[in-house]
């Protein structure tokens, strides 16, 4: 059996546990045996969602070890884009991305950074050129002398390029340098930015992707099989921790981008024969007085509070949609996979319905699933958008089902409730993996739910018996050959053990409380533990330490 766990996104890369890299008929994390193709959509009752105003749970932000800068490199000059950038972020428009009960969440907009991006897509040249304007707020308790941005496409795993030019702070040109072979951009401020103050940062950027490169590079930054995926195509402001900017070298193992919630207002010019799939929702198309060049379509998107802004352009794909609890779910797939495409819609809809009932309501108006050429991994999540490996659509096994369920769960555990995906990936991956079990329970499919749990047991026990057990709560770069077994399988089993200790009603009350407390924010393992203990009124420290912070033998549930 191949255990596929991607090092670049969220789901199963094939070289971690076995030699060779041939995606199998398995799916999810870990992949399941081929056990049929049930598309049953009846669901069992879940605990009713409580709307209790929970008391605050103590939290602490993790410290990030400092990283010495590499020799700086001045970035090249880029011509400015002709696409207009709005002068002020329209906060009222952001409500279009949120379901009405969550529009009040925008009252907290002053604590989020604001991105305004206007860009032109050229699918032939494989480039995105644009201008980014940001409103950056110093939410720390010390002045900022500089700002740091991640240029993720310059990471070797992306296989692309992202360069910037004409960087200005409050309309004043400023010096910039790059570090870590161009992956990190330093923007020196003309004067320190005091705590609580804001600065306007503008820059031009140019992104370049490869074509048909999913076998050798990151499939989510690549044009292939009718999908031009443009993950992290823009400069992303780094997070600021208690001890400074997050300047850690990015590990290839696990999710690369570690980002904070922000508001995005994005205007894109695209050739008329390409269709856009993005985070958020479209609010304008070819508005009078703001028309694009001939042969292009100009569209404006707003995100609502989101952890990232994902962009893809598609050509020649079919689509199907349905509504679930007010959210429009849309799937995109190649025409020759119509039956599987329709099945993917049923899976995504059932996943959303089940997790809404058990975790708390998804606050956004749209969710999209795209069949894509990923090759090295089976699925990857972005806020509101999920990419699924194309070969799963040709399978009659459980792979498509578990992969989509896993990625939909990430909309809660990663996108809405964030964590340090490079430093403590187990927190979102463990919950997303255990959600595969919960998904099958929502179908009343006890056989498949038990099979998922058994896969987690098999993977973890195989590693433990081989002497490869270890601490789960550690940076991705610290794992050596046991990332799958610990971050996915052992972590999923921890949440199963937690559920057994708490009981179903209290377990789901804990997850709802965790979601309510940290929605749009970031949590640590300690935050999660404190929330669980506050919900059950019990001491869970020993259970947590045994499974997560140490490598002592545990009773596998």
Q: Where are these predicted regions, by residue range?
A:
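C-terminal motif of bacterial Sec signal peptides marking the signal peptidase cleavage site
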Residues: 17-20
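Juxtacatalytic substrate-recognition/specificity segment
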Residues: 266, 297-300, 317-411, 415-424, ...
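Extended, low-hydrophobicity, Ser/Thr/Pro/Gly-biased non-transmembrane segments
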Residues: 204-311
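Solvent-exposed beta-hairpin/edge-strand motifs
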Residues: 145-173, 269-274
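Post-HExxH zinc-binding segment in Zn-dependent metallohydrolases
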Residues: 385-386, 390-391, 424-468, 540-542
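A surface-exposed beta-strand-loop module
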Residues: 157-223
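Amphipathic alpha-helical substructures
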Residues: 361, 447-448, 484-557
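N-terminal, polar/Ser/Thr-rich
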Residues: 23-34, 46-49, 54-129
């Amino acid at each position: 059996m191949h255990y596929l766990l991607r090092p670049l996104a969220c789901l199963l890369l094939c070289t971690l546990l076995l030699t060779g890299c041939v995606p199998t008929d398995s799916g999810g994390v870990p992949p399941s045996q081929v056990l049929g193709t049930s598309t049953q959509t009846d669901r069992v009752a879940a605990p009713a969602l409580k709307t209790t105003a929970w008391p605050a749970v103590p939290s602490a932000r993790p410290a990030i070890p400092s990283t010495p800068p590499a020799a700086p490199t001045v970035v090249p000059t880029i011509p400015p884009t002709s696409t207009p950038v709005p002068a002020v972020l329209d906060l009222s428009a952001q409500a279009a991305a949120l379901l009405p009960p969550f529009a009040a969440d925008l009252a907290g907009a002053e604590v989020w950074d604001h991105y305004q991006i206007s860009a032109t897509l050229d699918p032939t040249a494989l480039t995105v050129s644009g201008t980014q304007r940001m409103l950056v707020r110093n939410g720390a308790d010390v002045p900022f002398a500089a700002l740091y941005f991640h240029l993720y496409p310059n990471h070797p795993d992306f296989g692309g390029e992202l360069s910037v030019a004409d960087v200005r702070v409050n309309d004043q040109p400023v010096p910039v340098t790059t570090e870590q072979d161009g992956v990190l951009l330093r923007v020196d401020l003309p004067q320190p930015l005091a705590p609580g103050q804001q600065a306007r940062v503008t820059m031009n950027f140019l992104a370049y992707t490869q074509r048909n490169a999913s076998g050798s590079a990151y499939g989510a930054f690549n044009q292939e099989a009718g999908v031009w995926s443009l993950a992290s195509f823009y400069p992303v402001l780094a997070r600021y921790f208690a001890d400074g900017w997050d300047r850690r070298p990015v590990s290839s193992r696990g999710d690369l981008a570690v980002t904070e919630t922000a508001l995005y207002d994005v205007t894109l010019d695209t050739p008329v024969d390409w269709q856009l799939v993005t985070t958020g929702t479209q609010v304008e198309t070819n508005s009078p007085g703001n028309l694009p060049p001939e042969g292009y379509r100009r569209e404006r998107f707003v995100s609502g509070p989101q952890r990232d802004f994902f962009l893809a352009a598609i050509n020649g794909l079919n689509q199907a949609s349905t509504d679930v609890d007010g959210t429009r779910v849309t799937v995109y797939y190649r025409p020759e996979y119509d039956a599987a495409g329709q099945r993917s819609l049923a899976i995504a809809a059932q996943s959303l319905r089940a997790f809404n009932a058990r975790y708390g309501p998804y606050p956004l108006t749209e969710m999209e699933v795209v069949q894509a050429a990923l090759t090295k991994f089976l699925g990857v999540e972005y806020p509101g958008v999920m990419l699924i490996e194309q070969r799963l659509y040709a399978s009659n096994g459980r792979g498509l089902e578990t992969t989509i369920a896993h990625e939909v769960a990430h909309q809660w555990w990663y996108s809405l409730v964030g964590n340090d995906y490079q430093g403590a990936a187990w927190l979102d991956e463990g919950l997303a993996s255990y959600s595969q079990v919960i998904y099958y329970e929502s179908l009343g499919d006890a056989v498949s739910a038990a099979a998922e749990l058994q896969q987690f047991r098999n993977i973890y026990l195989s590693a433990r018996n081989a002497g490869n057990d270890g601490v789960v709560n550690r940076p991705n770069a610290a794992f050596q050959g046991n990332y799958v077994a610990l971050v996915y399988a052992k972590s999923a089993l921890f949440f199963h053990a937690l559920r057994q200790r708490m009981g179903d009603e209290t377990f789901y009350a804990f997850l709802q409380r965790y979601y309510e407390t940290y929605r749009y924010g970031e949590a640590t393992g300690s935050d999660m533990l404190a929330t669980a203990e506050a919900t059950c009124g019990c001491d869970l420290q020993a259970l947590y330490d045994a499974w997560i912070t140490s490598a002592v033998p545990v009773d596998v549930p």
